[in-house]
C-alpha cells in the first residue's frame, strides 16, 4: 500500500521538476534571445489579446512598433526613470530601501497597496509573466529580474521596457503611444509629452494620456521637476542610457 501511495507523489514531484526545468530553459532562452533581438510581443500583450477575444472583442489589437533607443527621445527614458525608478542605473534589479518602505506602508494601509517594483522588475513581469499579485509570480519575477540584470545592459533593459510598456487600451510601446496621442514619432517627444506618458504608468487603463485628470497633470508636473533634479539629458549620457 505504501508503494502505491508514494508512486503518485513521486510522479507529481518529477512532473513539477520537469515543468520548472522547461520553464527555466524557455525563459533563459528568451533572456538570451531578446538581449539582441527586438521583442515581437510580450506576455502582457498576449494576455490582453486573449482576454479581449474571450470577451468577444474581436476588433481589439494589441499594437506595438519596436524602435531602438536611438529612435526614442532621451526625455522619454528620463521621464520613466524619474517616475518609476530613480536608482535604476545603480541597483541590480531591486531597490531594497523602497521595498522596505512599501512593506511598512502596506502594513499600515491594507486598502491602499504601494508597490516598489523597479524598471527591471516591471520589464521581467511584462515580458514573461502575467498580471496580478501572488507570491508565486513575485518569486518568478525576482528570478527573471536577476537573469535580465546579469545578461542585459541597463540601456537594453530600458529599451525593452519602453517598447513593451502599456500606455493605454491596446497601446504598447512608446512609438505606438507617441503616434496615437501626439501624432509624431517617439524620437520627437518633448519633455512635457514624455512626462505625461510616464504619468499614466503603471495604470494606463485607469489614467488616460489623452484625457488627463487633475491627478495625472499634477504627477506630470512632479515628474518634470524630478527630471530637472536628476540633471536632464546629461543624466542619460552620464549613465550610458542613450
UniProtKB/Swiss-Prot annotation:
EC number: 2.4.99.28
Record keywords, A-Z: Cell inner membrane, Cell membrane, Cell shape, Cell wall biogenesis/degradation, Glycosyltransferase, Membrane, Peptidoglycan synthesis, Transferase, Transmembrane, Transmembrane helix
Top-level taxon: Bacteria
Pathway given in the UniProt record: Cell wall biogenesis; peptidoglycan biosynthesis
Record membrane topology: Single-pass membrane protein
Gene3D superfamilies, per the entry: Biosynthetic peptidoglycan transglycosylase-like
PANTHER family in alphabetical order: BIOSYNTHETIC PEPTIDOGLYCAN TRANSGLYCOSYLASE, MONOFUNCTIONAL BIOSYNTHETIC PEPTIDOGLYCAN TRANSGLYCOSYLASE
Protein function: Peptidoglycan polymerase that catalyzes glycan chain elongation from lipid-linked precursors.
Family label: Belongs to the glycosyltransferase 51 family.
Protein name per Swiss-Prot or TrEMBL: Biosynthetic peptidoglycan transglycosylase
Gene name as annotated: mtgA
Amino acid at each position: 500500500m505504501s508503494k502505491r501511495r508514494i508512486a503518485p507523489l513521486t510522479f507529481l514531484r518529477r512532473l513539477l521538476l520537469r515543468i520548472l526545468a522547461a520553464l527555466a530553459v524557455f525563459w533563459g532562452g528568451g533572456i538570451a534571445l531578446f538581449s539582441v533581438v527586438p521583442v515581437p510581443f510580450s506576455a502582457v500583450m498576449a494576455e490582453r489579446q486573449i482576454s479581449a477575444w474571450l470577451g468577444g472583442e474581436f476588433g481589439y489589437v494589441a499594437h506595438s512598433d519596436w524602435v531602438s533607443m536611438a529612435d526614442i527621445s532621451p526625455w522619454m527614458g528620463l521621464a520613466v526613470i524619474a517616475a518609476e525608478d530613480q536608482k535604476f542605473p545603480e541597483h541590480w534589479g531591486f531597490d531594497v530601501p523602497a521595498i522596505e518602505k512599501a512593506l511598512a506602508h502596506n502594513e499600515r494601509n491594507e486598502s491602499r497597496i504601494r508597490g516598489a517594483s523597479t524598471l527591471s522588475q516591471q520589464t521581467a513581469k511584462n515580458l514573461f509573466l502575467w498580471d496580478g499579485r501572488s507570491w508565486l509570480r513575485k518569486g518568478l519575477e525576482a528570478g527573471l529580474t536577476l537573469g535580465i540584470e546579469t545578461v542585459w545592459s541597463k540601456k537594453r533593459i530600458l529599451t525593452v521596457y519602453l517598447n513593451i510598456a502599456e500606455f493605454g487600451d491596446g497601446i504598447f510601446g512608446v512609438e505606438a503611444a507617441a503616434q496615437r496621442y501626439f501624432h509624431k514619432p517617439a524620437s520627437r517627444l518633448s519633455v512635457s509629452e514624455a512626462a505625461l506618458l510616464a504619468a499614466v504608468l503603471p495604470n494606463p487603463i485607469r489614467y488616460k494620456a489623452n484625457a488627463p485628470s487633475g491627478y495625472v497633470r499634477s504627477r506630470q508636473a512632479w515628474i518634470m521637476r524630478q527630471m530637472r533634479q536628476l540633471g536632464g539629458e546629461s543624466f542619460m549620457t552620464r549613465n550610458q542610457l542613450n
